[in-house]
Amino acid sequence: MYKSVLVPLDGSMFGEHALPSATSIARRAGARLTLAYVHEPAATFYGEGAVILSNDVDAHARLQKQAYLERVVLRFGDACPKQVSSLLLEGGVVEAICNQIAKDKTDLVVMTTHGRGPLGRFWLGSVADKLLRQLSIPLLLVHPGQTASDLKSDPVFKHILIPLDGSDLAERILTPATSLGQLMASQYTLLRVVKPAHPALPYTEGLSIAQMAGEILDRIEKLQSELRMEAHSYLTGLAEKLRASSLHVRTRIVFEEHAAAAILHEATSCGADLIAMETHGRGGLSRLFLGSVADKVLRGSMLPVLLQHPSE
């Protein structure tokens, strides 16, 4: 269960779109909610032709950020969680946030995929991406809208889609996903995307084209059946464990060459309002996130995505 939720803010309207989901989770879990804004002290340059930034200017910027945090807390009104605080952190953004997470024993970070930047800069390489690479706690990433967020809204995730690839690494998302879902009486769909079988061509001497085609189809059907049985056994075993905790779980097997496309299609088909997955599965920890299945899902869906980078 979540006990401490942190929301990094950057002073932009985009960054605030993480707040409704964060407060909804914090209220239901009785967790502490921390709003964090990082102040990066401006460097002072000396030398001919250099612009010298006075301490007064830096202090003024710090006060503006502190005032912003206070205004955000006031905007919650009656919807404000019982344990909410705001913190102005100092230093580099990623380092300051990571240090605060370690200090406060934060177990969930909620943030938008991007904040400031021209044309809504892609999240890869942003603070969210860098945090995901450094932290082993889950990050709930929310895509920002074009209008100001309603801080008094109460989003609920009623249906969580959990893609799994059969690896132990991928299964680690089950704990944070179900911890979140239990707060909201969610139902879950465990999805296994299986690549279609591509059997080797049969020995062709003496076979007609029709016989060869029939042989290939028979091999495909046999392999597909074996793959389906394996996936069914795997998902059924996981589902039974979750149902033992009184969770509402269904399973789904899809044959598709491209896993991300299948996940996005299934999210729409089953009416999911949250996708939860590990950043790495069978590819292992050395695999770059760029171009991975989780990366493509995050870019391709407007749904919130709960991601976790597995620790070794």
Protein language model regions, located:
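A cross-kingdom feature marking solvent-exposed beta-strand/loop segments within repeated
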Residues: A18-P20, T44-L53, L89, E95, ...
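A short acidic, glycine-rich active-site loop
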Residues: L53-A67, A213-S233
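Hydrophobic alpha-helical membrane-association signature
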Residues: A18, K65-Y68, V127, I173, ...
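Short, solvent-exposed amphipathic alpha-helices that sit
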Residues: S21, H60-V72, A96, P176, ...
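Structural beta-alpha unit
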Residues: M1, F14, L74-V109, A148, ...
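Ordered, small/hydrophobic-rich secondary-structure cores
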Residues: R28-D107
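Gly/Ser-rich helix-loop-strand patches that form or flank binding pockets
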Residues: M1, S24-R28, C98-D150, L264-E312
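Small/aliphatic-rich secondary-structure junction motif
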Residues: M1-L53, S85, P155-D218, A239-R252, ...
